[in-house]
Amino acid sequence: MFIREQKIRKPNGKSYSYYSLIESVREGKKVNKKVLANFGALSKSDVEKLAKRFSQIAGLSVDDESETDSEVVGFKYFGIPVFVRQFMKSLRLDEFLDSASSGMRIKFDLVAAFEVMVAAHLFKSGSRAELSVWDWQQKLFWHPHVTEDLDYQHLLRALPIFAGLQPPLEEHLHGRLVDLFSINVDLVFYDLTSSYVEGHGNWSELLIRGYSRDKRFDCKQIVIGLVVTREGLPVSWRVFEGNRLDSKTLDEMVNDLKTRFQLKRCIWVSDAGLLSKENLGVMRNSGYEYILGAGSGTYKEVKKALKTPEMQFEKIADVNVCERKINLELDDKKKISCRAILIDSDGRREKTAAILERRLNLVRDGFANLKKSVENGYYKTQEDIHIAAEKVLHKSCVKKYFCYEFGDQKFDYREKYELVRSQKEQAGRYALLTESKLEIEDIINGYKTLLKIEDAFRVMKNDLDLRPMWHKCDVNLEGHVLLCVCSYLFFRMLDLSLLKGELPTTPGRALQAIKEIRAVGIEKKHEHHWKLMKISNENLKLLDAIGIKDLKKIFNQWAVSAPPYNYERRLWTTQEEALKNRTK
């Protein structure tokens, strides 16, 4: 085991040294080097002290002077709480939570609980189970106001409180975002996703099996509706039952936003999943304009328009566009006239045709194998052959392109090639329905921006760990979703800060850089001190972009009253439970 120095020369000509603890491991005839720890940039004296300390641990002889040297006892994350606290102050969330909870009989720091769980979603890798978050929070170098140690039960008790504060929290965040980013909620995007749990979930009224965006139809789930601005900042969200249809959520969301936010003019943008006669009536009655995606499988008038061969397209916003007026019927039998922006996209055609071909190939291979099995006598009765054929077509989404015949020890199939060819030709066409007087290019660009909400769902599921959900009551599930959305808000605010500061990096990489800013606990002559690790110029620029100007000053203020380093991994919630588990 040894300490390795790695020198890196930057484009500006300066050289920097980074140190790692390396262990040599022999595997057969080879000796592989394994990195045990990365120390980052250290001074020569710190390297010598580390070497002496490791020598002491290994039982090697060292100079007597080592008794008076400093000893590194551990480190804590300092960049994480500073980052979270900065955005909390920008949004005045600490003031909001203190004010909202002033009349509640809460015996723990609600602001600290919010900060810890948001920080965990943004920075902590691995499971988001409350017990692991409760353990992980000890590694954070917090502001002196976080004096009490949050218990596992405090984090659980905070979730229903956050869920109950959601409506006023949404209104508070909307007001602050208008002030900070000068956002204009004249164009909002609405979409839904689902999130499943692995368990019976019999206690829940929300967890119900339904259409799963994650292809987990075997699991119970919730449906999450999210409204974001053109900048991708969340405005409002709701947790629905797992079997709620997309088209049955729009009425509630539109009326709720109209009542609480007093939006006079607003254009709602949604995909084809929200298009229905009922929802068209909802949008017209709300007084808001709309841009709704529509495929060939919705209104017959739209289907007929998309299949018209003599359409005259023109190139607008990188796609072929043709505008028509069509009459649509609402749920009350009333007829309306709206604009149909018919779009023919080569990129969409290529992608959709590739998806269709992949699904067709799966059925082709399945039927070919089934035919071979019947010929070899594996399936003999008509019933067995019929069941096997339906299994091949089940969930393939291409059943209409095939037909088959079967009998005793007989099976044959045929593909409808003309229908497949026609479908591939129409694959790049879709329509946008609107009554807005916007220019065609603005309508198309507005609909393309709908990708921002899809990006929000991707970030929450992949980066912020919306799953797994370990909660055993519906109100805690709603609190969990609220924390995920707030974490995504911080994520988007960081992205906008990077764009404003013209820093060529992603929010994910920026979060990793912030995580590397640490406070080191040092003991010298039985006295404990905190030191701030050296910060690179790139990290200083990053901190400046998000509004943190003097990190050392903040650290010195926090370190004055910070307790000595102390961390013990906690495996159980209470000492009594630990003893109980030991005796089993």
Segment roles from a protein language model:
Residues 1-113:
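Conserved glycine(s) in the ABC-transporter nucleotide-binding domain "signature"
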Residues 2-5, 11-13, 17-20, 28-29, ...:
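Anion-binding and metal-coordination hotspots
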